[in-house]
Amino acid sequence: MTVTRPRAERGAFPPGTEHYGRSLLGAPLIWFPAPAASRESGLILAGTHGDENSSVVTLSCALRTLTPSLRRHHVVLCVNPDGCQLGLRANANGVDLNRNFPAANWKEGETVYRWNSAAEERDVVLLT
């Protein structure tokens, strides 16, 4: 079994890319469902903070290089494309999406960019 895609095919994302919406500034929101998903499969997120783009570059290289049939986890390459484009930690609304996902331990506070309630931001609602 081949682990990597041929170099000539690595310019494009592998087949199976799905759109789940558009960002506030109109960027496509895409995810890569795992062809080899199971009950143990997880979700890999990158690009949550737009000013931390190394995860997007690394994950993009992995998606373009690895054979899709080996991918056991679902992938969202860039949760916050507007923040990545603008070089901001937050999204286009000024919300830190990492502090906005619904969680049992979510609480209000003085954390940078925290919003008023969990899962209020449309970018997070589209993902959950």
Residue ranges and their predicted role:
Residues 29-32, 61-62, 127:
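A generic local structural motif
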